[in-house]
A protein has these predicted regions:
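N-terminal subdomain of nucleotide-sugar transferases
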Residues: 1-63, 67, 408-409
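Carbohydrate-associated surface elements
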Residues: 184, 205
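Membrane-proximal helix-turn-helix segments that form the acceptor-binding/catalytic region
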Residues: 138, 157-177
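Short hydrophobic beta-strand element within catalytic cores of glycosyltransferases
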Residues: 329-332, 342
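Conserved donor-binding/catalytic core segment of Leloir-type glycosyltransferases
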Residues: 218-236, 242-248, 254-256
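Aromatic "clamp/platform" in nucleotide-sugar-dependent glycosyltransferases that forms part
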Residues: 312
Length: 409
């Protein structure tokens, strides 16, 4: 099968600079590699966002990357918003159509809403089925933001979200099929008018060869270790975790993510969080690592007794899944992918957000029972390997492709 994977603002060839340890670019590379391993030809179409990125390149056998010039590279933000991407959709979709007219794919898979807009425009009249995957829905983001409205560091609606809110339902209804990354997203898509029969749940996967219980472990200092991965912008959930830490004696917290370590002193969010930790009297038990490269995450995750998710909205729960794959139980809020991935009381704990006293109680209970943590860790590894390996995700993705190509025949 010839697969066209449209990812306007992601490329497995040249991952964007970013503050988080889990990037869409990396997952995209894993998915395409597994699809190619099963004998399919994959072409990733991405927007050229750096001057030194080649127009064409082979990622690995069976996977080619095409970077499309959709305007001046200098005008593309490092983390572009809706307005930046929407403005470039026509310049992105035109070349796509020309390429597909001469080299027609069997199926198109679009990642994110602007990619879907470009893919649908390019595939129009060519008879190519389009599979849409939103990765993140504005309706869910706005719901998460509403829960923390007017609180510092809360998720805020994108400046161009009006266009996104208006267009996401139309994109979902126009696609041949829609891939949801978690169960809650199915209900959100249905509320937008997307027919449930066209929706299939295919979560984001985990590299179970890299994220394993066995392997190097980051150095510890004798204290029980808690870890959270965040870009530091969502301060309110982090403040909740810091408050909980005051009631968990002799435990340390690693805050992984944000700008590079050398740039932390110049980061406003870091400064406010570090000051807050000092005010609480726990600065000596809180370490901000700054940005950590993807390959360096497994040793850190293995070194933690527990990983706590502080995300207000997390469609895929990627870092939580990575922790579980390393045998580290997760404490997470009941949002997005966590509701599917974390089995409450078996692989970790689901806990309501903004409840520092309850969080502290749960942390103390678990840290006082190392054997329970170990049991959760064993179950977590089994959960990830059986449900979230990229081999399985690729197989489920191909099942969606087979369905839409059969219907289009």
């Amino acid at each position: 099968m010839k697969i066209a994977l449209v990812a306007q603002n992601a490329t497995p060839l040249h991952p964007r600079a970013g503050s988080g340890p889990d990037r869409d670019d990396i997952g995209l590379g894993e998915l395409t590699r597994k699809l190619a391993d099963q004998g399919h030809q994959v072409t990733v179409y991405a927007q050229k966002n750096l001057a030194d990125v080649p127009d064409q390149a082979e990622l690995h056998a069976g996977v080619r990357v095409e970077h499309i010039d959709a305007g001046p590279v200098a005008g593309i933000a490092t983390e572009p918003g809706d307005a930046d991407l929407l403005e470039r959709v026509p310049a992105f979709s035109g070349p796509l159509r020309s390429l597909w007219e001469s080299d027609r794919p069997d199926v198109v898979h679009a990642l994110a809403w602007t990619s879907g807009l470009a893919a649908l425009a390019a595939a129009r009249d060519l008879g190519i089925p389009v599979v849409q995957e939103f990765s993140s829905l504005s309706v869910a983001e706005r719901r998460a933001a509403a829960g923390f409205r007017d609180q510092p560091g809360a998720v805020k609606a994108d400046g161009a979200s009006a266009a996104r809110i208006r267009l996401e339902p139309a994109i979902g209804r126009s696609a041949s099929a829609v891939v949801a990354t978690n169960s809650a997203e199915v209900s959100d898509l249905a509320s937008l008018g997307v027919h449930r029969s066209s929706i299939r749940i295919v979560p984001w996967g985990v590299d179970t060869d890299l994220f394993t219980p066995e392997g190097p472990v980051a150095k510890r200092n004798g204290r029980q270790r808690l870890l959270t991965a965040t870009d530091l912008t969502q301060r309110k959930p982090l403040e909740t975790l810091l408050r909980a830490l005051t009631k968990v004696s002799d435990a340390e917290l690693l805050v992984v993510g944000g700008p590079a370590e050398a740039e932390l002193p110049r980061d406003d969010n870091y400064a406010k969080l570090a000051k807050f930790a000092a005010t609480l009297g726990i600065a000596d038990r809180v370490t901000f690592t700054g940005k950590v490269e993807y390959a360096a995450m497994p040793p850190l995750l293995r070194s933690a007794d527990l990983v706590i998710s502080t995300c207000q909205y997390e469609p895929s729960g990627t870092t939580s899944l990575q922790a579980m794959a390393c045998g580290t139980p997760v404490i997470a809020p009941p949002v997005g992918g966590h509701m599917d991935a974390v089995v409450d009381g078996t692989t970790g704990i689901i806990i309501p957000p903004d409840r520092p006293a309850l969080l502290a109680q749960r942390l103390r209970q678990l840290l006082a029972h190392p054997m329970l943590i170990e049991a959760y860790g064993v179950a977590a590894v089994d959960r990830v390997r059986s449900r979230y390996s990229w081999d399985r995700i690729a197989g489920e993705t191909l099942a969606v492709y087979d369905r839409v190509t059969t219907q289009a025949a």
